[in-house]
Regions:
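Glycine-rich phosphate-binding loops of nucleotide-dependent enzymes
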Residues: 1-159
């Protein structure tokens, strides 16, 4: 985190017994003279959610009551709290349906457009071609090659 690198994993790594806002701000809660200022903490969480277009999520909502897809977006909002320069998303679409993937990609584009580099790990080639600028191919953990995604599209459409 100190290096500006944040991660969101395939299996959502959040605390289901906490609220959305508490998860977003975990470890970065706003403090007052008598400890954590929950009002300011939830206000800050709301700000981070809004930056990602997630104004509809109430930070007081129990995390356990929202869908896995929404939890994935909360995990990304949590990553943004540290002002990440790089966001690593490890198989974030593996348990999402097509509509949820579309929503996630819209959020990813917002994050990217804010200047954050995104490393998107996936086995779904159609998603890779849709969302990435550059493609790095690994086989058995070994680097094979790196190409610009746009340079592969002509090959893929004719295959």
């Amino acid at each position: 985190q100190n290096a500006g690198i944040a991660t969101a994993y395939q299996e959502v790594n959040l605390c289901t017994n906490l609220s959305v806002g508490e998860n977003v701000m975990l470890g970065h809660e706003k403090r007052g003279p008598f400890g954590i200022d929950w009002k300011k903490t939830h206000e800050a969480a709301k700000k981070y959610l809004a930056q990602m277009g997630l104004e509809s999520i109430d930070p007081h909502t129990p995390l356990s009551s929202i869908s896995i897809a929404m939890q994935q977006l909360v995990a990304i909002a949590r990553a943004m709290v540290i002002n990440a320069k790089v966001l690593i998303l490890d198989e974030p679409t593996s348990s999402l349906d097509a509509n949820e993937v579309r929503d996630l990609f819209a959020i990813m584009r917002k994050v990217r457009d804010s200047g954050v580099a995104i490393l998107f790990v996936s086995h779904f080639l159609d998603q890779i071609y849709e969302i990435t600028d550059r493609l790095t191919i690994l086989r058995n953990g070994q680097f094979i090659k790196e190409v610009m995604t746009k340079d592969t599209r002509a090959t893929n459409s004719s295959a």
